[in-house]
Amino acid sequence: MPKRNDIKTILVIGSGPIIIGQAAEFDYAGTQACLALKEEGYRVILVNSNPATIMTDKEIADKVYIEPLTHDFIARIIRKEQPDALLPTLGGQTGLNMAIQLHESGVLQDNNVQLLGTELTSIQQAEDREMFRTLMNDLNVPVPESDIVNTVEQAFKFKEQVGYPLIVRPAFTMGGTGGGICHNDEELHEIVSNGLHYSPATQCLLEKSIAGFKEIEYEVMRDKNDNAIVVCNMENIDPVGIHTGDSIVVAPSQTLSDVEYQMLRDVSLKVIRALGIEGGCNVQLALDPHSFDYYIIEVNPRVSRSSALASKATGYPIAKLAAKIAVGLTLDEMLNPITGTSYAAFEPTLDYVISKIPRFPFDKFEKGERELGTQMKATGEVMAIGRTYEESLLKAIRSLEYGVHHLGLPNGESFDLDYIKERISHQDDERLFFIGEAIRRGTTLEEIHNMTQIDYFFLHKFQNIIDIEHQLKEHQGDLEYLKYAKDYGFSDKTIAHRFNMTEEEVYQLRMENDIKPVYKMVDTCAAEFESSTPYYYGTYETENESIVTDKEKILVLGSGPIRIGQGVEFDYATVHAVWAIQKAGYEAIIVNNNPETVSTDFSISDKLYFEPLTEEDVMNIINLEKPKGVVVQFGGQTAINLADKLAKHGVKILGTSLENLNRAEDRKEFEALLRKINVPQPQGKTATSPEEALANAAEIGYPVVVRPSYVLGGRAMEIVDNDKELENYMTQAVKASPEHPVLVDRYLTGKEIEVDAICDGETVIIPGIMEHIERAGVHSGDSIAVYPPQTLTEDELATLEDYTIKLAKGLNIIGLINIQFVIAHDGVYVLEVNPRSSRTVPFLSKITDIPMAQLAMRAIIGEKLTDMGYQEGVQPYAEGVFVKAPVFSFNKLKNVDITLGPEMKSTGEVMGKDTTLEKALFKGLTGSGVEVKDHGTVLMTVSDKDKEEVVKLAQRLNEVGYKILATSGTANKLAEYDIPAEVVGKIGGENDLLTRIQNGDVQIVINTMTKGKEVERDGFQIRRTTVENGIPCLTSLDTANALTNVIESMTFTMRQM
């Protein structure tokens, strides 16, 4: 069937900011889809609120709108652009929910917009739990015994029929938001009320728990002629009960018999046909390990996290083909882009095993609740490819960057067996490593199976890994065993530990004896057809399929899994760097291990190596490809941390030299540079022991900021006010030592400013200066950034420009540099310098139309900025006002304090742009999920040091008609100024504030941190309760102030004469 000619313009909805449950996989899907539609000749309009994506680049669609993804804003775009059709299935749950709202409100009908791809009735049938269950019953497909509830009372009725445990799944949410497993009445009450709150339809499905069944997924495609195929089937190692996004996944499935595989395949295709899905779809099934009984768990009628994984696992570009199916093309008339000879209707075949392991944020949130269930907690994931299951698992483990390199924890020997078994009996993110530890101690596989329900097949594989460890120990230095361990994915580091050698010695031993990996191609067809895709993985076999060319090559290191502090912004920079390398005539090679991103799409670079970002794995590639040099400044801290290790092997680091990278990080050298170029910084000292830190603080004066050197995203950084807090920090948060000193700095309160610049060694250009709304002390990634600055004087701007140029030249930067300044009462100080690409590069590139990462890469190759047409200094300002607002995923992370401070907590960002600051802020706040209302109730409970400041705020909110609730201390302060406030009780008292929050009486909470055990606990409970009830909680008065400005600009003030 030819494609549709009755439509010309298509609107694509993106997925918005990165949150837990909806990460970079949608940037990848959206980018592919927009390009595919343009390839077919359609005019594409994209709307997405996330500036950190490749998808929102001007080249990807014909028109790009970076606006909040709300019904109101998308409706405005539809009225303005008059598209013929809307494609909703590529923007995750956000895109689907928007399409449903636009349909229900009549916007699509009024503007004659058709929905492409899967029909709305099918989407609703898959998403609405009641309709889905009815359809499954009609098809005779078993679903777990369940009931749909709209109230907590109905939930208790169902519980009386079936008993515990029960699984709660809210309708129309993703990442399991609001869901969970209930074992008793208290949990049932809490989870169901939460779930009803988060479900747009106020509807939850309660089902009898089938935890312990195998969880199997099929990624399927169907077109309008009813051709349907399975692209990939995957098996979760963790049984049903853990969200698939938090499970360790293997593809293809390893433990299904052919009968089971075909049975579940038939069911998946039967369901997708009955639903009438056109495009990609994900089917999740539960299989009883002891019989042929199965249940269907759910169907996602859209491109998902699993489809990104399936695309990278097979090389089959699901999103691209789904977009083409949506405009009428069929599977039997589209060529598979990987082979170029076979059609898309051929099911991919794999001659390797892939492992996916989720990346959790608990290294950032040590107090977060680690227990895993049906609500997702991972921020990202890694994937690895191997020829054996063991090899792919071990490669995935060392891609995680947790400091674990193998099936065990670094301090594993110190745990006693009872503790290890206790940890295995709970489902959490470290269970896999504790299982390895238990097998090492001789625990039987039967005992582990009874505790975890993990299939024996996988337990035997774990056992094999431990057996090889013992063999290495018994045959130290034996080449036969070295080669054998390599076949099963062991790293040099692990072998060195068992051989009683250094990692370097093992590496040399391999080189001398020619024990090197070969690289195999990912070709979708297990070498059945000729294929020439430049997509490779390493393994220890005989035939190398990666043909090395004579062209000069540049290797770019990617940024690994998405985590807090290192998000999709770094992938954005990586992709732009690759494009610049290709334009300059070099061969561009990427090494990365994140299946969700655009950079690991094989069509981006000349060669993609899907490998762990470790010294060993990267060196193996360098030894084969012999590139001109390696670029580390676009891959975040992951890549920067590899620079000196690679340089030791004689690898050339392109761009800013290793010596200068270290000068920016090393405290003493950096201070010497600042003195030389005459740029002031807050007074600071270095401490290697608690005693030294206390002496430093006495000299500098409290408050001080303390942090370890060499970290990204402000890990383990704190502001402390007295000796006791400092002692506590030095003994508990960090273990300071001469190798790992702690920095103790004067904490300056003032405006925080962020600047990104590009330098070619001679000229420094500054695309933009951003002012933060939150004062210094809040991590730059969690602050609202404003461009152009709104409150700085000409003198301050001139000083910032001068200092930036001096720093870039003083450090001899080649490429990008990011600098944070604070403007205190007595002038401008530099807070920190990062000699690499930063979180704000995509944001500034979009605003100013200066392709920063590409210019930086051209400078690295040796081009001059003046030849590209740029003059030194701050570049002309773009018209309008732009804000970058942070987005948090606290509703998915229990026990995490949401107070903003020097440690980064946000998972994503949105951009708001308009003609005034207030309008831009309104869009930024709305896009980040803060509902801005022109009237309502605000609850204020602030620490003593903030009481004076909160008075002015309360006065202004009162004048625009907000009702004020306050705790007694805050209310007494307001009463002194005749500001009316209703007093609410402290926690546990009469009329207590938690109850008021839970009852929905409050629209905004303003709460600032008070130190001291009792109050800290209370404050923590207040903040958690607000998050769990979906209410904005502002922990910085600067944010509250900005919100008040926006509210004032929307309404009229009422003052008596």
Swiss-Prot record:
Enzyme Commission identifier(s): 6.3.4.16, 6.3.5.5
Chain intervals for the UniProt region annotation (Oligomerization domain): 402-546
Sequence positions that bind Mn(2+) 3: 820, 832
Ranges for region Carbamoyl phosphate synthetic domain: 547-929
Binding site for Mg(2+) 4: 832, 834
Region (Carboxyphosphate synthetic domain): 1-401
Cited NCBIfam families: CPSaseII_lrg, PRK05294.1, PRK12815.1
PANTHER family named among the record's database cross-references: CARBAMOYL-PHOSPHATE SYNTHASE [AMMONIA], MITOCHONDRIAL (PTHR11405:SF53), CARBAMOYLTRANSFERASE FAMILY MEMBER (PTHR11405)
Domain notes per entry: The large subunit is composed of 2 ATP-grasp domains that are involved in binding the 2 ATP molecules needed for carbamoyl phosphate synthesis. The N-terminal ATP-grasp domain (referred to as the carboxyphosphate synthetic component) catalyzes the ATP-dependent phosphorylation of hydrogencarbonate to carboxyphosphate and the subsequent nucleophilic attack by ammonia to form a carbamate intermediate.
Assembly: Composed of two chains; the small (or glutamine) chain promotes the hydrolysis of glutamine to ammonia, which is used by the large (or ammonia) chain to synthesize carbamoyl phosphate. Tetramer of heterodimers (alpha,beta)4.
Protein name as it appears in the record: Carbamoyl phosphate synthase large chain
Classification lineage: Bacteria, Bacillati, Bacillota, Bacilli, Bacillales
Primary gene name: carB
